[in-house]
Amino acid sequence: MKLNDIREGNYVKEFEFSSRGRALEPFYRVKYDDLGYWHFMVGIPITLEWCKTLKMNTEIVIPTSTTRTNYDWIAEAPGIRIIEYNKAITVYHGMGGVKTILEHIKYVHQLQNFYYGYWGFEIDEENPTEFYKEPKNE
């Protein structure tokens, strides 16, 4: 299966260092607001509901007169952070060899030994636009 990655031209490599001065893996920052639509792959929109479906940790800012944040909502999972601010999506991830969110999810599942089970859905590799489906009970 060929996955379409549409990040070209919207992607810079950044490096971050820990407080101990130890270099971390390359950290990639991707801005999608100038594409007109925000996808990791064709057919998969990045929205707050999508992040909740993936069981990512999410936080929504409730606007008040004293709210001073630089995001409207934020979603995090191991190795990835997604931020929306003023209707622009910014994605940060530290998986250097991973080119699409499908590969990232597989990587995280394998790392945590949760592949096709813990999160309660399976990745439909035949049709990646149908990103998740309920597992079949046999």
What are these model-predicted stretches?
Residues 1-138:
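Structural boundary micro-motifs
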